Design a protein with these regions (language model features):
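Polytopic alpha-helical membrane proteins, predominantly small-molecule transporters/carriers
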Residues: 1-250
């Protein structure tokens, strides 16, 4: 993974927060309806992504954003509408992530993204990503809302944790697969707290920026970086996701 990949990933997770809140809060559609809307978008995106014979950067990142927006609304629904709270919601979602990775490993023998070379394995990949995004949202809300850290403090904590994972990648022999999934989960609460910092009212510790404006700016930044960062196409078979990682070279 390169720095360019992770910068776009953090922007995508932040967009997932502001975009999800735009539908559920600004449009006042609620968490359940918002989740159904984003579920539909996610299903369409993942079908197109898996059906593609080559790597399409815009499509790949659209699918990532679809998982972050759906993760936002699903986490809010589980935590708030179902009344299980942040701890209960995070526990349920963690169990879902572990189960999805366990089934993937049991079926294919590995959960490394370097093995994603068939549509079936790619489906495992996207299901695990969806659980990781939803879990990350719940963790971000839990940290910011219940520990007195606020959005800025929560963002600093998760940025620090992400830095530790990055250091471990260069300084230890810890499994790169484990570090990848740890980083993938941690970018989500970082983006969630940054998104809340942007659009929540000043009285709640935010900057009160319009959710629509924040989402538009974030989307524009993502598109600009996708176009600016050199990317190479991958073809089945041979590990399309792996080539997606290698393509994002800053």
């Amino acid at each position: 993974m390169t720095l360019g990949f992770w910068i776009i990933k953090i922007l995508a997770t932040t967009l997932g927060e502001t975009g999800g809140d735009s539908v559920t809060m600004s449009m006042n559609l609620g968490y359940a309806i918002g989740s159904f809307i984003f579920l539909g978008i996610f299903v369409v995106a993942i079908i197109a992504q898996i059906a593609g014979k080559r790597f399409h950067p815009i499509l790949y990142w659209m699918t990532i954003v679809a998982t972050t927006t759906l993760g936002t609304t699903m986490a809010d629904y589980v935590d708030r509408s179902l009344g299980v709270g942040y701890f209960g919601g995070s526990s349920i979602l963690l169990a879902g992530l572990v189960a999805s990775l366990a089934v993937w490993r049991w079926s294919e023998g590995s959960i490394s993204v370097n093995t994603v070379a068939t549509p079936r394995v790619e489906l495992f990949y996207w299901v695990a990503i969806l659980f990781s995004q939803t879990l990350g949202t719940a963790l971000g809300d839990w940290m910011a809302d219940t520990n007195g850290l606020g959005y800025e403090g929560g963002a600093i904590v998760f940025a620090g944790a992400l830095a530790v994972v990055a250091a471990a990648c260069y300084c230890t022999a810890i499994s790169r697969t484990l570090l990848f999934w740890a980083a993938f989960v941690l970018t989500r609460p970082l983006g969630a707290t940054l998104g809340d910092l942007l659009d929540k009212p000043v009285s709640h510790g935010g900057l009160a920026i319009s959710r629509y404006l924040a989402s538009g700016i974030l989307a524009a930044l993502i598109v600009a970086l996708i176009l600016l960062i050199p990317q190479r196409a991958g073809v089945y078979p041979g590990g399309r996701i792996r080539e997606e990682e290698e393509a994002l070279e800053a």
